[in-house]
Amino acid sequence: LTSSNPSEAKRAMAAVSGSTVNALGTAQRDALRDQMGWIRNRTTLMGVNPAYVNDDLPRFHMWMEGTGSYAQLDTRGDESGYRLTTWGGTVGMDADLSDRVTVGAAFTASYGDLTASAADSADGHLDSYYASLFGRYQNKRWAHTLILTGGWNDAKLNRTVNYGEGSYSTQGSTSGWGLGAMYELTYDIYLDENRSSVLQPLFNASVVTTRMDGYEETGAGNAGLNVGRQDWTTGTVALGGRWMGLIGSNIFGREALGEIRVNAAQDLGDRRGETNVTLLGNPGFTQSVRGAKAGTTALQLGAGLSVPVGTKGTVFVNGNADIRDGSSSVNGSVGYRYDF
């Protein structure tokens, strides 16, 4: 902090002030958005075939999937980004109540490794547990989907601060929660007479709000930080399209279904994390620490394949990507669905 080089002194001050602490709240927000996307991917294949008489309703279904993801936000100077790698699983149930209405619920556990590097460096974990309720209403060619998700997070962040010839390390643990809602509207445009290929223009709107509780660091005495609460609220609107088509059948006459998705999305609301911190040795002085900004306009890509197994089972795989200025993410899932 006493360096004669102003840029070195500024970077040292940023390190002492915890330039990486915003990684927790930013990663928490992005993980919740990924979770709602996974549930959305499942709902697109729900509902009954309107070409048949469905006189045995309600019908019940259950599915399980394993998920994995990698997300990163680029660091910009002393404004930290993050890297988060997650793996987890979901168990879901849904019921076709009528020719038009499907409802369901899903429960997810996800475990993540988190790293960040700016003026200081950090590593830790972000574990998340989600419950989702969803519904889908299909009326002729129009379909409406609503997803509500609540989550609880357990997090840990260990920082290392280098100064001159020395360094010190801190440890911090906290928890948080998040709520999200997503609505999607689609319209079916059949591309052949058999309705085996369909193009769906779509509109999607979502909002998430997250909170990571404040905490006190340990391990470095008075050099540790009291880290304030981290809050995010971000809305997203997207326009795009989805193609779905039958691409073969098994010996029982059940057909595999392929899917491709392309969206252009725009974020509204919070663009970066910002947290108040105080040194434990100087509690009267509070400083605001800012994280790196992510781009607000995104290209979202996705693909999926559902392959029938026997007369009542289906194996499915899905992949998604979100690409924007300064950040990107990819995720995938593989699972099994059973029709009772």
Regions from the PLM with identified roles:
Residues G68-S69, S110-Y111, A205-V208, V262-D267:
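Short, internal active-site loops enriched in acidic
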Residues L225-F340:
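Outer membrane beta-barrel transmembrane domains
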Residues L1-N194, F316-F340:
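Outer membrane beta-barrel translocator domains of Type V secretion systems
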Residues E193-Q200, T210-G214, S249-A256:
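Short, structured loop/turn "capping" segments at alpha-beta junctions
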Residues H144, G151, L185, S197-M212:
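Solvent-exposed flexible segments
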Residues L1, R76-T85, S117-G124, D154-S175, ...:
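Solvent-exposed, glycine/polar-rich loop segments of beta-barrel outer-membrane systems
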